[in-house]
């Protein structure tokens, strides 16, 4: 019996008490079930009686005694004790507790999934860095966290759409084009342009793809020429430079294990008239006005610190206008909730996006999530790593992966809460020792895989055998304290997934896996699984082997949620 199943059993007990007239309360949809800190308090505890007492106009202990009497009659419940002011301390029968291992092995990759958000469509946008340079270290964090969050959302029952918003319109594209053009001429980048060896690399590729560009360069007459040839050369450098940079970004993220459902071009919104359509709709809603030759959105009505311009006085749309059009575009595609993962320098966007949501008639608390993450720094041996050889004045995802590999990079970027600054010690996260969290978790999976291979070599049945009978294993024998601890930890995965999705906190998966790995290692050190020497396998051998297989399944499922591999050997 998993914690979720026990919670359902408690809800059923409340429902039965209400139906019988013993309680007069609204039956809750769900109740809290927790693992007590002290093993002597049972396998699980619930404060449900304290939560219902006020509405029932009864003392909490009275409510607890009513529910305890019903729970004691439930199959799989061995003992229920009312403790303190009205807590329910529940101990499961051996077969019910051990049944968690059986359930996990039977469910396989699907174990841990929930349907708590079934039918809700969520759009998750992350990274969305300008296509004017390599993927930076900060963007690497959002790539790892965003991809893990999309996997957690899916596991919690959401219908997820992931997007990268390509900022391929506006001033930054013009500056990048000017930087590429300067590199082609062997000149320094403009003061407001882009630096780094990568600009020269992109320039060489632009020239290789456009042989006629040499003639334009010659005809333009130099950097100060503002004639037609100069404009043509700038246009080619901007267009092709952005396309080449975007192709590199896509390849880098794909190599990092991050794939998107949609790469949405800002330019496409302009070309399709989506910005004008958004303004028209906002005008109809009564939130648009004109002043000083510009068109404004009255966002202060919805908590923003100032109204925002949609169209400048020179007639050009603002970035904010494109943001509003993009919000509208997502909602019109049927997404119920829009989730934006942004960097620390975008904190001001929270109020703006909430105002956009409200101006379109949505409830920001229901339709919008804006998650702000903090920055990442690298160090090696206590010394800060500050410079990328290729990018110049910033560090890149490639720098990190080149130093430690994809698995260590992804895990290390995800395991800390995104709202805390992160300093990664390259030596520490590449080290193959137990004080390195990613190694510790992956090693637990590899250790169990080795155990299962050894079991098969001894002729013992494992879940890999087509004829394996999971129901034939006597899981009631799993009563050793270390076995009970491990079973309790394994049962937590569905709730960890649910909370990670609800709180938008994929780091909870990583921390859970680290605790689980430690619990397994303690079990393995205390409970011998395979027979030694001339010993014959017994029923406890089969039960412990099943428990080990269940642990391997949960470790693999959790690592998959983080986009990290589960190695068979290390």
Swiss-Prot record:
The keyword ATP-binding applies. GO terms for molecular function: arginine-tRNA ligase activity; ATP binding. Disulfide bonds: none annotated. GO terms for cellular component: cytoplasm. It holds the Pfam family DALR_1. Its EC number is 6.1.1.19. One of its GO terms (biological process) is arginyl-tRNA aminoacylation. InterPro entries: Arg-tRNA-ligase (IPR001278), Arg-tRNA-synth_N (IPR005148), Arg-tRNA-synth_N_sf (IPR036695), ArgRS_core (IPR035684), DALR_anticod-bd (IPR008909), Rossmann-like_a/b/a_fold (IPR014729), tRNAsynth_Ia_anticodon-bd (IPR009080). It is found in: Cytoplasm. It catalyses: tRNA(Arg) + L-arginine + ATP = L-arginyl-tRNA(Arg) + AMP + diphosphate. A motif ('HIGH' region) lies at residues 129-139. Keywords: Aminoacyl-tRNA synthetase, ATP-binding, Cytoplasm, Ligase, Nucleotide-binding, Protein biosynthesis. Its main location: cytoplasm. Gene3D superfamilies: Arginyl tRNA synthetase N-terminal domain, HUPs, Isoleucyl-tRNA Synthetase, Domain 1. Belongs to the class-I aminoacyl-tRNA synthetase family. Monomer. HAMAP family: Arg_tRNA_synth. This is Arginine--tRNA ligase. The lineage of its organism: Bacteria, Bacillati, Actinomycetota, Actinomycetes, Frankiales.
């Amino acid at each position: 019996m998993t914690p979720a199943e026990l919670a359902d059993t408690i809800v059923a007990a409340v429902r039965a008490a209400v139906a019988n007239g013993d309680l007069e309360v609204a039956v809750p949809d769900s109740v809290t079930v927790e693992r007590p800190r002290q093993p002597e308090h049972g396998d699980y505890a619930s404060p449900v009686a304290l939560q219902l007492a006020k509405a029932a106009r009864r003392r909490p202990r009275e409510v607890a005694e009513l529910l305890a009497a019903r729970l004691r009659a439930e199959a799989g419940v061995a003992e229920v004790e009312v403790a303190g002011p009205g807590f329910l301390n529940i101990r499961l029968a051996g077969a019910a507790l051990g049944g968690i291992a059986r359930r996990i092995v039977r469910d396989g990759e699907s174990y841990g999934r929930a349907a708590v958000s079934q039918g809700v469509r969520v759009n998750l946008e992350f990274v969305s860095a300008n296509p004017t340079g390599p993927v930076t270290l900060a963007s690497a964090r959002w790539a790892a966290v965003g991809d893990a969050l999309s996997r957690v959302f899916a596991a919690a029952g959401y219908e997820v759409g992931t997007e990268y918003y390509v900022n391929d319109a506006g001033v930054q594209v013009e500056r990048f084009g000017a930087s590429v053009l300067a590199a082609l001429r062997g000149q320094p980048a403009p003061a407001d342009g882009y630096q780094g060896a990568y600009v020269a690399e992109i320039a060489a590729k632009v020239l290789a793809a456009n042989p006629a560009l040499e003639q334009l360069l010659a005809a333009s007459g130099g950097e100060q020429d503002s004639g037609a040839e100069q404009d043509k050369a700038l246009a080619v450098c901007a267009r092709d430079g952005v396309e080449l940079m975007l192709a590199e970004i896509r390849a880098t993220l794909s190599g990092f294990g991050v794939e998107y459902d949609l790469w949405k071009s800002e330019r496409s919104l302009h070309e399709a008239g989506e910005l004008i359509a958004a303004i028209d709709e906002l005008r109809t809603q009564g939130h648009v006005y004109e002043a000083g030759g510009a068109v404004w959105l009255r966002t202060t009505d919805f908590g923003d610190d100032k109204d925002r311009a949609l169209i400048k006085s020179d007639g050009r749309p603002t970035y904010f206008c494109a943001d509003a059009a993009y919000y509208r575009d997502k909602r019109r595609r049927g997404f119920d909730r829009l989730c934006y993962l942004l960097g620390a320098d975008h904190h001001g966007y929270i109020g703006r996006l909430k105002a956009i949501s409200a101006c379109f008639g949505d409830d920001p608390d229901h339709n919008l999530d804006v998650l702000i993450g903090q920055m990442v720094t690298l160090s090696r041996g206590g010394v800060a790593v500050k410079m990328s050889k290729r990018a110049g004045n910033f560090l890149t995802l490639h720098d990190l992966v080149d130093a430690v590999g994809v698995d260590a990079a992804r895990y290390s970027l995800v395991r800390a809460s995104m709202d805390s600054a992160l300093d990664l010690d390259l030596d520490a996260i590449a080290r193959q020792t137990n004080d390195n969290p990613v190694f510790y978790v992956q090693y637990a999976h590899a250790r169990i895989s080795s155990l299962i291979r050894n079991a098969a070599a001894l002729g013992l049945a494992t879940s890999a055998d087509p004829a394996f009978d999971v129901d034939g294993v006597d899981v009631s024998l799993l009563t050793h304290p270390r076995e009970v601890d491990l079973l309790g930890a394994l049962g937590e995965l569905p709730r960890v997934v649910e909370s990670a999705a609800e709180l938008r906190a994929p780091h909870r998966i990583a921390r859970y896996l680290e605790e689980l790995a430690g619990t397994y290692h303690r079990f393995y050190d205390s409970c011998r699984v395979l027979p030694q020497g001339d010993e014959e396998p017994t029923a406890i051998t089969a039960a412990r082997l099943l428990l080990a297989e269940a642990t391997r399944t949960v470790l693999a499922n959790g690592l998959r949620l983080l986009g990290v591999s589960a190695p068979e050997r290390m």
